[in-house]
């Protein structure tokens, strides 16, 4: 491959106590929490809106955020849920502890922006991470490409909220990633209109009526109406009076760190969505006039880099509902390891793991602070999908409420590090836990 040497003088345009890279659910929680503690926080996002997959990615629903007795993403996450309820009374659950929230993307991105600006976070959109300047294991600055050109940001502490662990990996932190044969598939979520909800309810083919949907999928696959034998039909969610969000179909073997793979995944996903549009119109009552009006601007990546941290949260910890002395949160979503290949057998393996890993009412696993601390980089925390864990734990903690929890913990840890003039590893754990409890975090069973 041909190579060039690229040299350019780049202005250090911004300085902050804490720079958060990536405004997905985890990065937003980190930025708002750190700023709420008094730190000067800069949040940089490559897109034109906050929220990542929860908004730009068009993910239509929050995965469970409760253990059946209490809301687990207490603190930042609970504030988001309260504001979602206030804006969407007609679709809000009567009992938030035991129900699901549908995501209205426009409302959610405004809620995120309100929480960020109210806490004093400086937001910069359309700024894409381009390079990292590291000296002796410490990030001195990060370089971004923006409409104004390239610029650098310096900070005492950096937080990686990129989802893919890009900042950490480019800074020299070790990581692991599943092979192309094992990696979970991705989904391009979508927005649909023209649905007759009364007819849909009476038709019997709800997304939660698995047998009815599988029969229809099987018939369509055998008839050649769907190009792939993907029986893992993941979701239809009503997000407005006459619209729904689709978490439908998969693209397999996507490498989130490769622009060619991402591009092919997006192209293939949009083609498959048209297949499913025809399938729904033909086979599902109430969808005769339905149409897709929008698909996500981000491909729904379920698995990419997992940073190797000071501790690797594992499935045995999960199953034992283990608590940790440095626990900074708790969560309980089952191990939702989407099959890496289509087919009936792979679906059955997924269902077996998902059901067997479901925790009981009131149970949850602890999240230690150490999984946010990447090895070999001193002034960096990670949060969201790229935290240090095994694949089964990733399949639980990667969803939106889990990202709020790890983001909140990273933000508080960073703020205390700045205040104490120390590194994230030097933070007093008792003080960290005390401050998290003060803002509503759930730390113990």
What are these regions (language model features)?
Residues 136-142:
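Short, hydrophobic/aromatic-rich segments at coil-to-beta transitions
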Residues 7, 33, 39-40, 45-131, ...:
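Conserved N-terminal/central alpha/beta ligand/cofactor-binding core
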Residues 16-17, 37-40, 119-122, 151, ...:
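Loop/turn elements at helix/coil->beta-strand transitions in domains of secreted/extracellular proteins
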Residues 9, 53, 145-146, 150-157, ...:
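Flavin (FAD/FMN)-binding glycine-rich loop and adjacent Rossmann-like elements that form
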Residues 25, 102-107, 267, 426:
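Soluble non-cytosolic domains of exported or imported proteins
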Residues 18-42:
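N-terminal Rossmann-like FAD-binding beta1-loop-alpha1 element of flavoenzymes
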Residues 12-16, 26-27, 55, 151:
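Ligand-binding pocket scaffold of soluble enzyme catalytic domains
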Residues 1-18:
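Extreme N-terminal leader/targeting segments of oxidoreductases
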């Amino acid at each position: 491959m041909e190579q060039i040497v690229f040299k350019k003088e780049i202005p250090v345009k911004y300085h902050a106590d804490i720079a958060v890279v990536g405004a997905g659910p985890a990065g937003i929680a980190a930025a708002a929490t750190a700023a709420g503690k008094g730190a000067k926080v800069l949040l940089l996002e490559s897109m034109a809106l906050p929220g990542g997959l929860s908004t730009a990615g068009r993910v239509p629903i929050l995965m469970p955020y409760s253990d059946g007795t209490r809301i687990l993403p207490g603190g930042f996450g609970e504030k988001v849920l309260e504001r979602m309820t206030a804006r969407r009374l007609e679709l809000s659950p009567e009992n938030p502890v035991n129900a699901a929230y549908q995501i209205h993307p426009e409302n959610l991105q405004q809620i995120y922006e309100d929480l960020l600006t109210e806490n004093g976070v400086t937001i910069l959109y359309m700024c894409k991470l381009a390079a990292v300047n590291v000296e002796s294991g410490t990030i001195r600055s990060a370089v971004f490409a923006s409409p104004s050109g390239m610029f650098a940001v310096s900070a005492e502490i950096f937080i990686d909220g990129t989802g893919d662990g890009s900042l950490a990996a480019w800074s020299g932190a070790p990581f692991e990633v599943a092979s192309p044969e094992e990696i979970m598939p991705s989904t391009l979520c979508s927005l649909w209109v023209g649905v007759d909800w009364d007819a849909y309810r009476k038709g019997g083919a709800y997304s939660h009526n698995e047998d009815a949907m599988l029969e229809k999928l099987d018939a369509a696959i055998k008839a050649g109406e769907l190009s792939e034998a993907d029986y893992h039909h993941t979701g239809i969610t009503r997000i407005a009076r006459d619209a729904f969000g689709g978490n439908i179909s998969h693209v397999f073997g996507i490498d989130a760190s490769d622009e060619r793979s991402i591009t092919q995944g997006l192209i293939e996903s949009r083609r498959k969505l048209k297949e499913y549009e025809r399938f729904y119109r033909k086979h599902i009552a109430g969808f005769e006039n339905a149409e897709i009006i929008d698909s996500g601007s981000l491909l729904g990546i379920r698995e990419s880099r997992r940073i190797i941290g000071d501790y690797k949260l594992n499935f045995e910890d999960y199953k034992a509902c283990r608590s940790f002395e440095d626990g900074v949160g708790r969560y309980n979503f089952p191990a939702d390891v989407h099959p890496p290949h289509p087919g009936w057998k792979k679906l059955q393996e997924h269902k077996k793991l998902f059901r067997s890993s479901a925790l009981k009412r009131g149970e949850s696993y602890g999240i230690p602070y150490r999984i946010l601390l990447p090895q070999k980089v001193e002034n960096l925390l990670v949060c969201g999908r790229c935290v240090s864990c095994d694949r089964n734990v990733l399949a639980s903690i990667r969803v939106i409420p889990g990202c709020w929890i790890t983001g909140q913990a990273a933000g508080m840890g960073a703020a205390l590090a700045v205040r104490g003039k120390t590194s994230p590893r030097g933070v007093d754990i008792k003080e960290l836990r005390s401050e998290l409890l003060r803002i509503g975090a759930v730390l113990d069973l």
